[in-house]
């Protein structure tokens, strides 16, 4: 029995129709792992940074009609919420597991927060080839950093500063059949390796 990782059947929770039925499927097939990952990586981040991190598992409480197309656990140093500050996420869509760190459009002082990526531009450029950028946390679409020009990246930074909906996340993704998801040991190793890279941009 696995505690942390996700199998293809877990991703299938997103194929269940209807809000109530999908929420029930997510609560049964996905939320237990997110809760365990929340506890594990809150401690991991505290050890790595010396700061206390709080896990926030998505509840989707505001939804009344449309079922969620993704779900996640987020990590931030604020125990009341995470959207207002740069934060880490582990989550999944039907066809993608994602690990991200960045700035959401709701964040306070977005222009100042995205500056961490500008200041660490060389580190961003030198990330392994499977790292990507997400400009919208609600979309599965992400662009590999090695396929982006410097101008593409600086345009993305400017968008965060100038556009209300502007966001910037550095991400790493897996398909549901990835070898990194075959067992807890492989998955935790993948996640720790990813967090180690993402922490380069944490101030």
From Swiss-Prot:
Q: Which InterPro entries match?
A: UPF0637, UPF0637_domain_sf
> Which residue windows are coiled coil?
none
Alphabetized Pfam families for the sequence: DUF1054
Lineage: superkingdom: Bacteria
- SUPFAM superfamilies registered for this protein in UniProt: YktB/PF0168-like
- Family listed: Belongs to the UPF0637 family.
Query: Entry's HAMAP family?
Result: UPF0637
**What is the protein's given name?**
UPF0637 protein SSP1683
Look up and give the organism this protein is from. Answer: Staphylococcus saprophyticus subsp. saprophyticus (strain ATCC 15305 / DSM 20229 / NCIMB 8711 / NCTC 7292 / S-41)
